[in-house]
């Protein structure tokens, strides 16, 4: 009996900067462990497929191609797991790069949420590489050969659960996206977060 609770987890994979194949392998191992523990929702860190500290490597098409290939491996691995997984990945849309959270399960991508607020102070200078969520005017994106919903206001609903996603700095602003998500029915907010140390 679960008494209406949902079993959730956060997972921090061992990560190597710009080694998408290695990182996706670590993520898949954690997905399999989550499946053994009957986790229903598992949240991974921001940019966990590439590593957060890639710097100007984010401008390299090879890294971005490898990131999407690694994401495809992870999506395929979810065919054997029951958990909804949320992973961080840099993704392109029409020559613009976004820091995104990808919501996946059952071998499919349910939606992709771009980061709304990019930090640009101290050691953080994401605006050098990424566009903010409001810089997209399309409601979908082609990723891993799938056309999927894309935007900062996505809600993922199943039964009585309505889930929303935000990334790191989004939580730090005066009125975070989670406030609006909650007003629109979200009862679970998943936050992907990473800070270099």
Where are the regions a protein language model picked out?
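Enzyme catalytic cores with a strong preference for nitrogen-chemistry domains
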Residues: 1-195
